[in-house]
């Protein structure tokens, strides 16, 4: 079968679209990446997404409208990746869309129950492409008592499991998440969780203080020095010491967090500040490794994927902290760092169509293994 996987993460750096060929399912899955693109998200749409994520700025009409706007944008990404590959869209068997997370409540509090909201209307994607769409992957895991995240460990287990190495896969998108795959393990031995901020705070600082979308190659951070007092304060965030399973997002480390931090440390040199928040991401990864992974598994190799894999300063900090572990990017290991999550949803969508379980309960904390995703049929019929 041929599929397009779509991913728009918390970093808002674009819509990732991967065209892939997939066959089999479970341990017999074979997947081949054909083409990959990242479709830029306009500043206006980014601003609308950020507003939707902030209680004081959001509104029901904004969320309602943005749900459909993103549906059209995701459709454009599907058409673009197929066009780049000279692939006729009529030959697509399905589209797997993660959507755009607007809010994520992994654990109930006050009068709010565990819940999550991803938008990017699948009916619009299905209509615009006349293709079956699998979407809304996280909600069934939450219904089963899980946190709805992380979901990529299932695909990582299928693609990366090794008989001879204990592997850790650290994705650094807006938020960081890590998957541990012990050597010669089965799916129930895999565990994963969000490590905390990834690129989200770094990008926010870069946009505010340097008028750049992101810190390309970690250039600005490389010019600064770590402010130890500030770093100690950042590392005191209660999320870091929370034991897995755990997940987080923009609602914790987004614009409100950034505003408060920049106001508190406005006296810090901007180069030192971006160096410090870059080290914060690295040290959050190290803290989680030391406290929640090392007691269970001695990791041989850490593979870094996502946009953070291109930040040379961040990679350098991680290597300094994890001296006993081989640290590589996923590209160095033979896989695309950028296409990883979009490809994961192709695999998850395929499992949905095969009526197969694809949540990893040791990662999400769900009570049961469940079939993930909602299916929106082709609007004009046919297989």
From Swiss-Prot:
ATP binds at residues 9-16. Catalyzes the specific phosphorylation of 1,6-anhydro-N-acetylmuramic acid (anhMurNAc) with the simultaneous cleavage of the 1,6-anhydro ring, generating MurNAc-6-P. Is required for the utilization of anhMurNAc either imported from the medium or derived from its own cell wall murein, and thus plays a role in cell wall recycling. The keyword ATP-binding applies. SUPFAM superfamilies: Actin-like ATPase domain (SSF53067). It holds the Pfam family AnmK. It catalyses: 1,6-anhydro-N-acetyl-beta-muramate + ATP + H2O = N-acetyl-D-muramate 6-phosphate + ADP + H(+). One of its GO terms (molecular function) is kinase activity. NCBIfam families: PRK09585.2-1, PRK09585.3-2. It is an enzyme of class 2 (transferase). InterPro entries: Anhydro_N_Ac-Mur_kinase, ATPase_NBD. One of its GO terms (biological process) is peptidoglycan turnover. Belongs to the anhydro-N-acetylmuramic acid kinase family. CDD domains: ASKHA_NBD_ANMK. This is Anhydro-N-acetylmuramic acid kinase.
């Amino acid at each position: 079968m041929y599929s397009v996987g779509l991913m728009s993460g918390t970093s808002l750096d674009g819509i990732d679209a991967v065209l892939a060929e997939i066959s089999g399912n479970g341990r017999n899955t074979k997947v081949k990446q054909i083409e990959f693109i990242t479709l830029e998200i306009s500043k206006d749409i980014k601003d609308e997404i950020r507003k939707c994520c902030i209680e004081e700025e959001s509104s029901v009409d904004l969320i309602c409208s943005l749900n459909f706007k993103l549906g059209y944008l995701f459709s454009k990404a599907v058409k673009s990746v197929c066009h780049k590959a000279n692939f006729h869209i009529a030959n697509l068997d399905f589209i797997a869309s993660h959507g755009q997370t607007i809010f994520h409540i992994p654990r109930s509090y006050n009068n709010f129950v565990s819940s999550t909201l991803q938008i990017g209307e699948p009916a619009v994607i299905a209509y615009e492409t006349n293709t079956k769409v699998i979407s809304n992957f996280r909600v069934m895991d939450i219904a089963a008592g899980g946190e709805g995240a992380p979901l990529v460990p299932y695909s990582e287990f299928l693609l990366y499991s090794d008989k001879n190495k204990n592997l850790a896969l650290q994705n650094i998108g807006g938020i960081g998440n890590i998957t541990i795959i012990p050597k010669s393990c089965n799916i129930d031995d895999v565990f994963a969780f969000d490590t905390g901020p990834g690129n989200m705070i770094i990008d926010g600082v870069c946009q505010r203080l340097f008028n750049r979308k992101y810190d390309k190659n970690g250039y600005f951070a490389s010019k600064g020095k770590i402010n130890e007092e500030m770093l100690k304060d950042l590392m005191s965030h209660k999320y870091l010491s929370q034991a897995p399973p755990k997940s987080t997002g923009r609602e914790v480390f987004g614009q409100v967090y950034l505003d408060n931090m920049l106001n508190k440390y406005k006296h810090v040199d901007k180069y030192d500040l971006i160096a410090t928040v870059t080290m914060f991401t690295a040290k959050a990864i190290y803290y989680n490794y030391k406290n929640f992974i090392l007691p269970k598994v001695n990791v041989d190799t850490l593979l870094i994927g996502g946009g953070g894999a291109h930040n040379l300063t961040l990679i350098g900090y991680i290597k300094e902290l994890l001296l006993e572990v081989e640290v590589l990017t996923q590209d160095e290991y033979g896989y695309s760092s950028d296409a990883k999550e979009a490809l994961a949803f192709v695999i998850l969508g395929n499992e949905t169509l095969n009526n197969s379980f694809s949540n990893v309960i040791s990662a999400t904390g769900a009570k049961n293994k469940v079939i993930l995703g909602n299916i929106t049929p082709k609007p004009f019929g046919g297989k």
